[in-house]
Amino acid sequence: MGAPKQKWTSEEEDALRAGVRKHGAGKWRTIQKDPEFSPVLSSRSNIDLKDKWRNLSFSASGLGSSKLRVPKITGPSSSPSSSSQPLLLPAANKFTEATLPADAEKKPQDGKTLPKYGAMIMEALLELNEPNGSDIAAIFGFIEQRYAVQPTFRRFLASKLRRLADSNKIEKIDKSYRLPDSLATRTPAPMNASAPKQKDPSKPSKVSKAIGLFSASSPALEAAMAAAVKVADAEAKAHDAHDQTMEAERIFKMAEDTESLLIIAAEIYDRCSRGEITTLVPVAQREI
């Protein structure tokens, strides 16, 4: 084990930036051998320079840029190697899909939307009772017939259905939704020995009439509906931005690994062309 890495100083960072401006990104050995920068960067390896430059690049862009600057891949370096020391060949990286912790994927459910929307969705799924689930259009059509809702409610409905599915309150089958079997088959116990009175499906209940009247005449409820739609849109955009950031970081890492392999291949070719014997020693990939 080597000595512990020291924290980068501002002088070393300035020297690294100046070296990249002079020789370009990826020319870490050339920057180290440059008399202008070697006194300052003598204690750093080419891997240290590469990692530090990546951190500086991400810090400058804030990981939020839609265009990722991929370092230019150049040809083999013309500087000869004076020794035939074993060449360290980094092991191949294992790229896996970025996953979030289970707690991070769960979005807050309480206090964000009005309680009656969830009840309206549950009522629609219970009445439709499709074995393979009902799609968003069918659920929206049922609710629109029962209650006076705005046309923008459909956009909010998709977000609400995803939340209910994430919280295991409903089941998602492809692009359709249905109630769990435990809820779909649950029947209330009778209050007395006589058979319960059947409701006429064509006549909405008193609660439904009250909700529909309130929805059509209350400016406060319309404002709450518009705010809920904006919240749902913001959450969807934030999720898409996070996915794009993770994909950009993955592509940037792939470009760096490709550049490293090209540098190693160029050095192997340079040594073999001079008749030197090159030994490849695999090393374990560091975890980032």
Swiss-Prot record:
The gene is SMH4. This is Single myb histone 4. Residues 76-87 have a biased composition (Low complexity). Keywords: Chromosome, Coiled coil, DNA-binding, Nucleus, Telomere, Transcription, Transcription regulation. HTH myb-type domain confers double-stranded telomeric DNA-binding while the H15 domain is involved in non-specific DNA-protein interaction and multimerization. Residues 230-250 form a coiled coil. InterPro entries: Histone_H1/H5_H15, Homeodomain-like_sf, Myb_dom, SANT/Myb, SMH1-6, WH-like_DNA-bd_sf, WH_DNA-bd_sf. Binds preferentially double-stranded telomeric repeats, but may also bind to the single telomeric strand. Belongs to the histone H1/H5 family. SMH subfamily. Pfam families: Linker_histone, Myb_DNA-binding. One of its GO terms (cellular component) is nucleosome. SMART domains: H15, SANT. Forms a homodimer and heterodimers. GO terms for biological process: nucleosome assembly. It is found in: Nucleus; Chromosome; Nucleus, Nucleolus; Chromosome, Telomere. The lineage of its organism: Eukaryota, Viridiplantae, Streptophyta, Embryophyta, Tracheophyta. Gene3D superfamilies: Homeodomain-like, Winged helix-like DNA-binding domain superfamily/Winged helix DNA-binding domain. Residues 1-42, 62-87, 181-206 are annotated as: Disordered. GO terms for molecular function: double-stranded telomeric DNA binding; protein homodimerization activity; single-stranded telomeric DNA binding. Residues 1-60 form the HTH myb-type domain. Residues 113-181 form the H15 domain. Residues 28-56 bind DNA.
